[in-house]
Amino acid sequence: MKRDFISILDWTSKEIRDNLDFAAELKQQTKEGKCPQLLKRKTYGLFFHKPSLRTRLSFEVGIAQLGGTSLVLSEQDFKIGERETVSDVARVMSRYVDGILIRTFSHQMVLDLAQHATVPVVNMLTDFNHPCQVMSDMLTIKENLGHIDNVRIAYIGDSNNMTISWLNLAARIPLDLRIATAPETMPDMKLVSEIQEIGISTIKVTNSAQEAVEGAEVLYTDVWASMGEKDKIAERELVLKDFQINSSLLKYAEKNAIVMHCLPAERGKEITDEVIECAQSVVFDQAENRLHVQKAILVQLEKWRTV
């Protein structure tokens, strides 16, 4: 049965938990020099409308480790929705590859691809959400805290696709999620209410970074202006200046709290050099875990496809 990974909401709580366990197994096997050829003779089409370092490397390396092949296409190679319709591209690609992976601006494009493709579609990032990243984050949290349930997470800064990803996750895994941002950059409060109504997580939105961080086990941030928002940088730096993760703010968190950032980071803006390089920072563990979580996602989708 063909299934996709476009949002965390596409999978159940059990499926998410099982996949994290599987990712941990794959990570351990990799460290032992074992790479089970679970994607042998499988080919994946990787589409990039946005520049990429971690996403491209982690997917290409992961697919290769498991015996598969990657075909990478940039925006210069194809014009989905311009030269050809999304539906035509999806149906043609489905005849060539075993999975379509896309990193783009438009979330609707990914949904349209999934609607018409007969092979799994994976959202490598859109302006709306970033499910592979939040899965990697949860593996990192589990490694450091020993569990993922009811973790006290303080998300500090701009409300963006990562904020939405964390809110979606809170609909599947019980979290104590605190979002601290400026009045000008508040998240979609309708979505916040919908997640709260599900009733498994506690969600709080505040304009005080200190309030969000008090007693937190995880401090999380992202860039203040996402890719394609260069015109908003000056405004964001002004309104979000009090939402920087620095050593002063870190003091309000739990003593052994971990600091997370999905990268790339604008050091000195949303997070200081001192904090990103401190002993509590797990930023580069997050980056590594993209590799193993994404391998687990692709293997699971292939298993479902052949059932």
What residues fall within each predicted segment?
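Positively charged, low-complexity intrinsically disordered leader regions
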Residues: 1-57, 61
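Active-site cofactor/substrate anionic-group-binding motifs, chiefly glycine-
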Residues: 43-44, 48-96
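Glycine-rich phosphate/diphosphate-binding loop of Rossmann-like nucleotide-binding domains
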Residues: 49-61, 143-221
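Short, structured coil segments at secondary-structure junctions
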Residues: 66, 96, 116-117, 173, ...
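Anion-binding alpha/beta catalytic cores of soluble intermediary-metabolism enzymes, centered on
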Residues: 98-169, 261
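Rossmann-like adenosine-cofactor binding region
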Residues: 196-274
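Adenosine-phosphate binding glycine-rich loop
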Residues: 256-257, 263-307
